[in-house]
């Protein structure tokens, strides 16, 4: 289903660029995704139930997503027709990836032993921006007591580990190799 999700996301992304509504589309799709996530199991059951014909699924889209822009709603209708409403979170994740790529930004998770101040997060963010070449990072601070000290940052698929836990693990590996 990941390939299908990427195709929907790509089509919506290209339409958003063509119609110059990328930011609006992202905001509305994020709101739709936020509404769908707690009801994902119900949506999956409804979507896969053979008793629910396409008209029923389209009625659900019409009533549940009033007020969203026509391009997003049209994609939801196509997804309903093809019984793909259950992959909506995957489609949003793929769309979000394209959106972030367009703006040269990404999400970063910064793990630390204690909560970092905004000033500390800004400094870490600046260092990560220099190392990754991105224009912007959306940073989330997560407390992880197992790090002992230091920080570990994840940006996309890259991990920057400056934790004491990592230092100790590297020392341990060196000892094992020299035995």
Swiss-Prot record:
Q: Which InterPro entries match?
A: ATP_synth_OSCP/delta_N_sf (IPR026015), ATPase_OSCP/dsu (IPR000711)
The organism that produces this protein has a lineage beginning with:
Bacteria, Bacillati, Bacillota, Bacilli, Bacillales
Which family is it part of? Belongs to the ATPase delta chain family.
Keywords of this entry? ATP synthesis, Cell membrane, CF(1), Hydrogen ion transport, Ion transport, Membrane, Transport
Question: Where would you say this protein principally sits, based on its record?
Answer: membrane
Q: Tell me the gene name.
A: atpH
Role this protein plays: F(1)F(0) ATP synthase produces ATP from ADP in the presence of a proton or sodium gradient. F-type ATPases consist of two structural domains, F(1) containing the extramembraneous catalytic core and F(0) containing the membrane proton channel, linked together by a central stalk and a peripheral stalk. During catalysis, ATP synthesis in the catalytic domain of F(1) is coupled via a rotary mechanism of the central stalk subunits to proton translocation.
Descriptive protein name? ATP synthase subunit delta
Q: Name one GO molecular function term.
A: proton-transporting ATP synthase activity, rotational mechanism
